[in-house]
A protein has these predicted regions:
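Catalytic histidine neighborhood in serine/cysteine hydrolases
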Residues: 204-226
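Short beta-strand/loop motif that positions the catalytic acidic residue
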Residues: 182-184, 188-191, 195
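The serine-hydrolase catalytic nucleophile loop
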Residues: 58-72
C-alpha cells in the first residue's frame, strides 16, 4: 500500500467550513486538465509580494488548517496559499504521493508567474505529513526560506511509529531524508520534544543531513497537536525571517489584479459536482 488511511486519515468533509471560507478558495490548473483547490489568504486592501506555500498536516485539510495559516499570514504580513491534497476536502481522488509532489511545483510556478514574482518572494511551510512535500518543493525550486514543523525522515519511519512491522508494506515515498540534501535555502525546524506521533529525533536526523543554514527549535512541552501556536511556531518563524532572510516589502495593488483573482476564484464545474456528491453523503 502507498498510503494507509489509518496512518494518514483525511477528516470528514465539513460543508459549513466550505461556506465560511469559499471566498478564499482559488483553483489552480494542473497538467491533467483538472484543478488543485487552494485557500488564498491575504490582506484585503493590498497584497504583499511575498507568498508562503503552505502544506497542512495529516488528519486535517485546507479548511481545518486555516487557523494556523491565518495566524502565519497576519504575523508575517505575507500571503499564504494552502494547497489541498487529492482525497482531502473538495479535491476528488486518492491520496497519492506522486501526485502531491507534482502539485507542489505546479502551484509554486503558477503563483510565481501569475503575480510576476522572483524566487526571493517565495517561502514554503509544511507541518507533519506536509513537511515532506514542503522539503521536496524547496529541493527542486529556490525559495527564500523553508519552515517545517514536526518533520520526519521518511513515510516508512512515521508509519513504523504507529503500525510497527506493517511499515514494510508501505512503498518508500515522501523520503525527506533524500530531498533535504538538495535544499539550499535557510531552513527553520520546529519539533516538540513531547511529540508521541513523530519523535523529535526524526527532525534531529534531518538537521544532520541538510547542507543549508538552519535553526532548530524543540519546545519541551510541545506535542504533535498541543502547542502554543504563536509562541512555539508563528513568532519564532517571524524572528527567523528577520534574522536570515532579505524580505521584499513591495506590495501589489489588489485593484490591478482583481480580474485575475476573480478568475482563480471561479469554481470549476467538476468540483461543483463533487461537492454535491459530498453533501449527499453527509446527509
Amino acid at each position: 500500500m502507498e498510503f494507509n488511511n489509518f496512518v494518514f486519515p483525511a477528516p470528514n468533509f465539513e460543508y459549513h467550513l466550505l461556506e465560511i471560507l469559499k471566498e478564499k478558495m482559488i483553483f489552480i490548473p494542473s497538467k491533467d486538465n483538472h484543478y488543485i483547490p487552494c485557500l488564498f489568504l491575504h490582506n484585503e486592501k493590498e497584497i504583499s509580494k511575498n507568498f508562503i506555500i503552505f502544506f497542512h498536516g495529516n488528519a486535517e485539510d485546507m479548511f481545518y488548517s486555516n487557523e494556523m495559516a491565518r495566524a502565519l499570514q497576519e504575523i508575517t504580513g505575507m500571503n499564504v496559499i494552502i494547497v489541498e491534497y487529492p482525497g482531502y476536502s473538495i479535491y476528488k481522488g486518492e491520496a497519492n504521493s506522486t501526485k502531491i509532489l507534482e502539485n507542489t511545483t505546479i502551484v509554486y510556478d503558477f503563483i510565481k508567474t501569475q503575480f510576476n514574482l522572483e524566487d526571493n518572494n517565495m517561502f514554503v511551510f509544511g507541518r507533519s505529513i506536509g513537511t515532506s512535500p514542503a522539503i521536496y518543493l524547496a529541493s527542486v525550486r529556490k525559495p527564500n526560506a523553508l519552515f517545517v514543523v514536526s518533520s520526519f525522515t521518511s513515510i516508512r519511519a512515521v508509519a513504523g511509529n504507529l503500525v510497527g512491522p506493517l511499515k514494510y508494506l508501505l512503498k518508500q515515498r515522501f523520503t525527506s531524508e533524500e530531498y533535504i540534501k538538495n535544499v539550499t535555502c535557510p531552513i527553520f525546524f520546529v519539533h516538540g520534544k513531547s511529540d508521541p506521533l513523530i519523535p523529535y529525533t526524526e527532525t534531529i536526523s534531518l538537521t544532520k543531513i541538510c547542507k543549508s543554514k538552519y535553526e532548530l527549535l524543540t519546545p519541551s512541552h510541545m506535542t504533535h497537536n498541543d502547542f502554543d501556536l504563536y509562541e512555539d511556531i508563528i513568532e519564532p518563524i517571524q524572528k527567523f525571517n528577520e534574522n536570515n532572510c532579505t524580505i521584499d516589502n513591495g506590495k501589489i495593488n489588489i485593484d490591478d489584479i482583481k480580474n485575475d483573482i476573480d478568475k482563480l476564484h471561479k469554481m470549476p464545474q467538476e468540483i461543483e459536482f463533487y461537492i454535491r456528491d459530498l453533501k449527499d453523503k453527509v446527509k
